[in-house]
Every structure is written in C-alpha cells, then in structure tokens.
C-alpha cells in the first residue's frame, strides 16, 4: 500500500478567508507557498508516495489557488527529491491536448521522472466558462448531469485523452477528430526552411505538414 497527499492550495486561515478576497492578498499567497514547500519537504522525507494538486483558476476567495498545474508541480518538485508530483489534473475543457502532452513530457524530464498526471473533465463552471478552449464546451456537475452538455463534455474528454496519449506514444502523428485536428487539414507552413524537411518528418519539400510531434519525448 502506498500513501499520498493532496492539497487544494488554500491561502488563508479561517478568519482571514472570512474577511473576504483572501485570494487577492499577496502576503497570504506568499505564506501559502512557504508552507507548501515545508509540507513537500516533510512528505518527501517521511516516505510518502506522492503529493497531488488540482487545476483551478480565478479563485479570488482564496480557497483553491492552485492555478497553473505545471507551475505548482515545479514548486512542489523543487522542494522534494523522491516522491511523485501529481496534478489532478489537467482540465480538458480548458487545455489544448497537444500542448498538454508537451507539458507532461517536459515536466517529467524536469522532475526526473517524478511527474504523475491526471486528466479531468472540469466541474467549476465559473472559471471553465472563462477559460474553455471551444465555445460548445461546458463544465459538468449535478446541475447538468445526463444532459446534452454532459454528453458533449464526455465525448470531448474521450477525444482529449486519446490525443494526449497518442502524442506521448508517437514520434509523429496525424489525428483528425471531431473537436481537434493535428495538424490542421491542408496546412502549409509559410516559414519555408529546409531544416523542417531535412531534419524532421511529416513535412514535404513544399512545406505541406502531414504529421506533427511533441518534443521532448517523455
């Protein structure tokens, strides 16, 4: 059996949160970062398997200021040596799946193979509606369970996961889905340079792009 920790990244004590707008107070955020560093160092030394955190945005109230999962992962990683750093996780409705795969691969290198990944559908409507990558997407929760919005979100999520996994496993790929196409159909790179055709793959001498891949390889 393995044990891990999970945090929501709450910036204030109860009385500080109840004063309002705690998330906008730099001194509280700085204190939280310092405390997270101490938690990570202790958990690492105590032998915990991993330390997890979510992706949430626009949290002016201060309850869940995890923001960019990559930045928080690097903060945790910089204060630990052995345990996994786990994001729970990249919110599909707010992220480009190809870029997500690239971030995962890059972070795993930077963390020495210690990056753990979760992919999720997104349930906090306030920030998802402001960050979503496609207009037809919505956050999901009890208020819209088993509705068309829920079905679209689930269908999109399945494609998102498939693209992330395909990009991580493939040297290059051509993915034509319902929501995403990588590379875009009939795309010709206007930056005409022989480096693309001579030292890569998936591009012809006319700069027509038929395949694309992430770098580095995980």
Kindly give the residue locations of the regions a language model identified.
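Short, well-ordered coil/turn segments that N-cap beta-strands
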Residues: 1-3, 47-50, 80-85, 111-116, ...
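N-terminal beta1-alpha1-beta2 module of alpha/beta enzyme domains
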Residues: 1-79, 83
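A cross-domain feature marking catalytic cores of carbohydrate-active enzymes
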Residues: 5-9, 55, 87-89, 115, ...
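Active-site mouth loops of central-metabolism enzymes
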Residues: 18-34, 90-98, 145-146, 218
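Acidic, glycine-rich active-site loops and adjacent beta-strand->loop/helix elements
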Residues: 56-58, 64, 89-98, 121-125
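Outer membrane beta-barrel
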Residues: 79-86, 92, 100-101
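Internal, glycine-rich beta/alpha segment that forms the wall or movable "lid"
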Residues: 99-218
């Amino acid at each position: 059996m393995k044990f891990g920790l999970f945090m929501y990244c709450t910036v204030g004590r109860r009385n500080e949160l109840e004063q309002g707008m705690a998330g906008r107070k730099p001194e509280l955020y700085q204190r939280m970062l310092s405390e997270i560093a101490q938690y990570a160092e202790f958990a690492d030394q105590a032998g915990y398997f991993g330390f997890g955190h979510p992706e949430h945005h626009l949290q002016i109230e201060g309850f869940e200021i995890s923001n960019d999962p990559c930045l928080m992962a690097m903060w945790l990683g910089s204060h630990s040596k052995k345990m996994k750093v786990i994001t729970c996780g990249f919110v599909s409705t707010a992220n480009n799946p190809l870029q997500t795969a690239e971030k995962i691969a890059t972070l795993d290198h930077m963390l020495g193979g210690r990056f753990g990944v979760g992919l999720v559908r997104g349930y906090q409507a306030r920030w998802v509606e402001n960050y979503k990558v496609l207009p037809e997407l919505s956050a999901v929760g009890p208020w819209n369970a088993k509705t068309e919005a829920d079905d679209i979100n689930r269908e999109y999520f399945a494609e998102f996961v498939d693209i992330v996994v395909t990009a991580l496993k493939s040297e290059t790929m051509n993915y034509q889905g319902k929501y995403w196409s990588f590379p875009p159909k009939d795309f010709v790179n206007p930056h005409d340079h022989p480096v693309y055709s001579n030292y890569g793959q998936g591009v012809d001498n006319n700069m027509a792009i038929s395949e694309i891949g992430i770098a580095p390889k995980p």
